[in-house]
From Swiss-Prot:
Presence of keyword Transcription regulation: no
Molecular functions per Gene Ontology: 5-methyltetrahydropteroyltriglutamate-homocysteine S-methyltransferase activity; zinc ion binding
Source taxon at top rank: Bacteria
Disulfide bond entries: none
Residues binding 5-methyltetrahydropteroyltri-L-glutamate, per UniProt: 17-20, 118, 520-521, 566, 610
Name of the molecule in the record: 5-methyltetrahydropteroyltriglutamate--homocysteine methyltransferase
Catalytic residues of the enzyme: 699
Pathway participation: Amino-acid biosynthesis; L-methionine biosynthesis via de novo pathway; L-methionine from L-homocysteine (MetE route): step 1/1
Keywords noted in UniProt: Amino-acid biosynthesis, Metal-binding, Methionine biosynthesis, Methyltransferase, Repeat, Transferase, Zinc
UniProt-annotated binding residues for Zn(2+): 646, 648, 670, 731
Length: 760
């Protein structure tokens, strides 16, 4: 019998973001629900055909979502938040939960969207389920069953995928005090029984049930709940229990006791778990080996994976399945849409469509197909060639990396000395006012950027247009009487992509989009070689802006860890090494900025916290190199050069030591929505440097009043000495318009001026 091959899921957005554009048309009222559903059906059909035509044993159904697969599960379970429930749920119900509903919408009262948060340690976001003690679950949303029928009628052998009951509960939150959401499990399991029975009646043989929390360090109460859950939901379908993103070493002894028929493990994230899993695998279970990495863009070394899995095949026989490591949701759709890439670079990559082919080819090779074995060897050759390419592994970069010592991470003076130098050089008032960096990306800016990229504007013409926007931003800030100005970042489409386009070692794509949430997609750059800065990146823009004003101009950089976390990294070197390469490049930029007369430089690190590994025991090692990378970037600054960093998190307690270890002169943080509660972590830690707690929620169109900002600043002054407080918005203002921005900043400046007298 042939080796069973499958993937855990396929991108839902379409090759050219067709779903994104259709959703946004629907939300604007430009197409109706029938047209939207027709487009969705076409995307699903294409995805299933890709899998079946490649030779996979199963086509995966249930991976399509109009907004988010966790939200789809919420509706499947009849668990719509009460504020959005309105009889039988439909697509509009789903969108209200994900996006919220304004007061004027549909003639009804407004209702807030459910929270959104990161899906484990990926850059995908899910809609957080909400739980109350009286919640009931009733299968009422037919999408899964309809899509299974679609696939069966189209002639595909279907494997539905379903988020498991324990992961669904774990990933949610209680919205009332005094109860534990785990107590809802018995009620939830009844709904899962109904789902599996329905799938069995449709002729389904195998169901993929995703329980990614089995890769975490679970509390005993959660780990112990699995045995009951999988006894109760047992039905006539076979269950493949699916884990990903890390090893199951902490939960394996619990897993092998479960009443299921197979286990999927992520061998890309954790290859070392294979031997232990095989040793403990129950005799009747299948083992799905996730060897094709679903989280990246790199071609799989099929020759190496064949050699690795061949003895497993000999031992397990037909019980060995071959699969992607996780859903291909996290990979761009199709490499064939990138004709501009060189043949060499293209030979290094595999996007979702190509990864499907990899899984199928490896399966045939394990079945002894000689042509497939030879094809695996040929396919893997570019990976071997790349290892010795000097334009990938650059001697000059390696030499700099080898020269990194502890002294390279240290500023030349401690904070107290630096603060005295900076006070003298900068001449700033009490409660200095500034912004986080970006100003509104107007329609004019976007039109001019597009014209430049399509050749309709020359480099000179584009630069002149950008200087016009910078001059306008400086003029507006001076009129507002802000103390520290920024140039506004008109030249940047994205805070990471801009640096990727200007550093050697990156590759950008045209259609390398992946879903972030809902209709929002991102196009991460790809680290393809050792990273170095060949010329200054931001100096021209910052110095031009400084030439227009006598006030201090802040240079703006994206930090090394954030660039790393928001790109596709290399697989052949460690993340630590990539971060160090980025840090050295940014260090040179810091030196050039200060030598050009820029006295304040901000190095944004919004992603340090989200880069944390899933297992807490791995946190310290990560935080050590992440902090060191930031410090390498900043340590070339002279004592009189003030280094800022910006972070936007909802929780600082677990990383406050590391935040302090960054030794930034000023940290600006997002606090307005928490009413300054986030400052408790800094107060308890006795954070020694300067802090700018955000007083303007830039995610909302609401304009904060002067009185509101004053109240927030007074709260902040109770937790942080006023001599160390800055006044600023929560985040950059790229997504706001100028009217909102100027009105809010006028109130911010007025509040700061008033409190300088009161709090002095």
């Amino acid at each position: 019998m042939a080796t069973t091959t499958h993937i855990l899921g396929y991108p839902r957005i379409g090759e050219k973001r067709e779903l994104k554009f259709a959703l946004e048309k629907y939300w604007r009222g430009e197409i109706d629900q029938a047209e939207l559903k027709q487009l969705g059906a076409g995307l699903r059909e294409k995805n299933w055909n890709t899998q079946t035509e490649a030779g996979l044993s199963f086509a995966t159904a249930g991976d399509f979502a109009w907004y988010d697969h966790v939200l789809t599960t919420t509706l499947l379970l009849g668990h719509t938040p009460k504020r959005h429930a309105n009889g039988f749920p439909d697509l509009d119900t789903l969108f209200k939960v994900g996006r919220g509903q304004s007061q004027s919408g549909c003639g009804s009262a407004g209702a807030a969207a459910s929270d959104m948060t990161k899906w484990f340690n990926t850059n995908y976001h899910y809609i957080v389920p909400e739980f109350s003690k009286d919640d009931a679950f009733e299968v009422s949303w037919p999408q899964l069953f309809e899509e299974v029928n679609e696939a069966i009628k189209a002639g595909h052998k279907v494997k539905p995928v379903l988020l498991g009951p324990l992961s669904y509960l774990y990933l949610g939150k209680e919205v009332e005090e005094g109860f534990d959401r785990l107590t809802l499990l018995p009620r939830l399991l009844t709904a899962y029984q109904t789902i599996l029975s329905k799938l069995a009646s449709q002729g389904v043989e195998w169901v993929q049930i995703d329980e990614p929390i089995l890769s975490l360090e679970l509390q005993d109460k959660w780990a112990d709940a699995f045995k009951l859950a999988y006894q109760v939901i047992r039905s006539d379908v076979k269950v493949l229990l699916t884990t990903y993103f890390d090893s199951v070493s902490d939960t394996l002894d619990k897993i092998v006791e479960l009443n299921v028929d197979g286990l999927h493990i992520d061998l890309s994230a954790s290859p070392e778990q294979l031997d232990e899993v095989i040793a403990k695998l129950p005799e009747h279970w299948v083992l799905s080996a996730g060897v094709v990495n679903g989280r990246n863009v790199w071609r799989t070394d099929l020759s190496t994976q064949f050699a690795r899995l061949q003895p497993v095949k000999e031992r397990l026989g037909d019980r060995l399945w071959v699969a992607s490591s996780c859903s291909l949701l996290h990979s761009p759709v199709d490499l064939d849409l990138e004709p501009a890439l060189s043949d060499e670079v293209k030979s290094w990559f595999a996007f979702a469509k190509q990864k499907v082919t990899e899984v199928a080819l490896l399966g045939r090779a394990l079945d002894g197909d000689r042509n497939a074995i030879l094809a695996c060897e040929t396919y893997s050759q570019p990976i071997q060639d790349r290892k010795t390419a000097t334009h990938v592994n650059k001697p000059q970069v390696q030499e700099r990396l080898n020269s990194i010592t502890a002294s390279l991470t240290q500023r030349s003076a401690p904070y107290a000395e630096r603060a005295a130098h900076q006070a003298e050089v900068l001449g700033l008032p009490l409660l200095p006012t500034t912004t986080i960096g970006s100003f509104p990306q107007t329609g004019d800016i976007r039109v001019q950027r597009s014209a430049y990229r399509t050749g309709k504007l020359s480099q000179t013409e584009y630069n002149q247009a950008l200087k016009g926007h910078i001059a306008d931003a400086v003029k507006r800030q001076e009129a507002l009487d802000l103390d520290v100005l920024v140039h506004g970042e008109a030249e940047r489409n994205d805070m990471v992509e801009y640096f990727a386009e200007n550093l050697a070692g990156f590759q950008t794509t045209k259609f390398g989009w992946v879903q972030s949430y809902g209709s929002r997609c991102v196009k991460p750059a790809i680290v393809v070689a050792d990273i170095e800065r060949e010329k200054p990146i931001t100096v021209e823009w910052s110095t031009y802006a400084q030439s227009l004003t006598s006030k201090q101009m802040k240079g703006m950089l994206t930090g090394p860890v954030t660039i790393l976390c928001w790109t596709f990294p290399r697989e052949d070197i460690t993340r630590k090494e990539i971060a160090e390469q980025l840090a050295l490049a940014l260090r040179d930029e810091v030196s050039d900025l200060q030598d050009s007369g820029i006295n304040i430089i901000q190095i944004d690190e919004p992603a340090i916290r989200e880069g944390l590994p899933l297992k807490k025991r791995d946190h310290d090692a990560y935080l050590q190199w992440a902090v060191d990378a930031f410090k390498i970037s900043a340590a070339s600054a002279k004592p009189e050069t003030q280094i800022h960093t910006h972070m936007c998190y909802s929780e600082f307690n677990e990383i406050i030591d590391s935040v302090a270890a960054l030794d930034a002169d000023v940290i600006t943080i997002e606090t307005s929505r928490s009413n300054m509660e986030l400052l408790k972590a800094f107060e308890a830690f006795n954070y020694p440097n300067e802090i700018g707690p955000g007083v303007y929620d830039i995610h909302s169109p609401n304009i904060p009043t002067q009185e509101w900002i004053e109240a927030l600043l007074k709260k902040a002054a109770e937790k942080v000495p006023v001599q160390r407080l800055w006044v600023n918005p929560d985040c950059g203002l790229k997504t706001r318009n100028w009217d909102e921005t100027e009105a809010a900043l006028a109130n911010l400046v007025s509040a700061a001026k008033k409190l300088r007298t009161e709090l002095a």
